[in-house]
Amino acid sequence: MDKLKKYTPDGMRDILFKECEEKLYVEKKLRNLYKLNGFSEIISPTLEFYDVFNFENQPIAQEKMYKLFDRNGRILVLKPDMTMPIGRIVATKVNYKDYPLKLCYTSNIFRINENLNGKTSEITQSGIEIIGIENIKADAEVVITAIESLLQLGLKNFKIELGQSKFFKEIIKNENINKEEVFTLKNLIENKNYVALKDYLKEKTKIIKADTIKILEQLPRMFGDIGVVYEAKNLVNDNEQLKALDEILSLYKIIDKVGLSKYVSIDLGMIQDIDYYTGVIFKGYVEGVGDYILSGGRYDKLIGNFGCDLPSTGFGINIDNIIEALRIYEVLNIRKFRNVILHCENKYLNRAYKIANRVRKNNIICEISLRDTIEDTIKYARSKCVDKIIFIDNREFIKIYDINFNKSKEVIIDNFLEELI
């Protein structure tokens, strides 16, 4: 086993220095936005019982979960998602009466990625959940918060695609097709495989009504601006189908009034995980990033799996994909701090620490050199791209060396901060 001690497992990676700073920056920006919107943060354990994720229509295949056993032989998993643990917590730990309950989170999740394809199996997910209320205002707040999250991070070249899980369900509700056939239909429509879908539906003319086939054939093409919804309404007569489409229209109108509709498009063929969702669904894409960066929607039946029926809606952001997008568009505006190093002999360390604390109170990074010689300190400072070195002894003056200009200046100790700020 010693041969593996220098490596990370498949799908795992180390995050170092600049990338770590970028990640913490993004997480902090999102946390602050959630807090200012009235969301309270929640943290769930990394290990959960497998049962938390083992229920009908949950969207994560058990083959994608990292499993292990506790000392009693019970199956545990590294949590593959945050929404279901939040459902467990709300149903069992939160004594809340005045809904809605607005929660947010930032956490690592784990999903086995067998093909890898540059993807990792450990993902940082950040998001919000609005629990205990079922209305269009809650749906709008979730989508608007998703848009504002991306804008807050500096992204502009993105689209939030809105779909409706109810629409497809209502289309096939009265058709005599089994789960396997529904699964095939969903994949063909989601992947916009027009030819294969048409051929498949030709084989099903005896069990699927002609009007239904006509709508299903059009579903992969029903994407674009809000006009797509009006086109869909002209194709259907069923009241429940029309009601599902009206929900998207109502949501879009709110987003439009807020002035954010330019970031929204429609995709009625977005139906891959609709068994999990019960209403409006959405995904966020950034031009140049291959995978979606966020996803969400309404899932009114999920918390019922934990014995507490509460309507819910929310979204999760893939932090790793967000950082990729921010790099592409060069909008990672991380504040840069001035950086100095302080050098002294051991006998002046007491004085050095007092001066260092004065420097740090002015939001300047101040590192006390651990090198013994001036030459080694200068060499170390250059490797760290430090601007200035402060030399301290027992005098009332201190020497400040500017590395970039190769110049030194002695200043009275009471006034030295002016030379750094």
Curated annotation (Swiss-Prot):
Protein name as it appears in the record: ATP phosphoribosyltransferase regulatory subunit
GO annotations of cellular component type: cytoplasm
Protein task: Required for the first step of histidine biosynthesis. May allow the feedback regulation of ATP phosphoribosyltransferase activity by histidine.
Alphabetical keyword list: Amino-acid biosynthesis, Cytoplasm, Histidine biosynthesis
Pathway annotation: Amino-acid biosynthesis; L-histidine biosynthesis; L-histidine from 5-phospho-alpha-D-ribose 1-diphosphate: step 1/9
Gene designation per UniProt: hisZ
SUPFAM superfamilies: Class II aaRS and biotin synthetases
Annotated compartments: Cytoplasm
HAMAP family recorded: HisZ (MF_00125)
Miscellaneous: This function is generally fulfilled by the C-terminal part of HisG, which is missing in some bacteria such as this one.
GO biological process: histidyl-tRNA aminoacylation; L-histidine biosynthetic process
Record GO terms (molecular function): catalytic activity, acting on a protein; histidine-tRNA ligase activity; transferase activity
Similarity remark: Belongs to the class-II aminoacyl-tRNA synthetase family. HisZ subfamily.
Signal peptide segment: none
Predominant cellular place of this UniProt entry's protein: cytoplasm
CDD domains linked: HisRS-like_core (cd00773)
PANTHER family xref list: ATP PHOSPHORIBOSYLTRANSFERASE REGULATORY SUBUNIT, HISTIDYL-TRNA SYNTHETASE
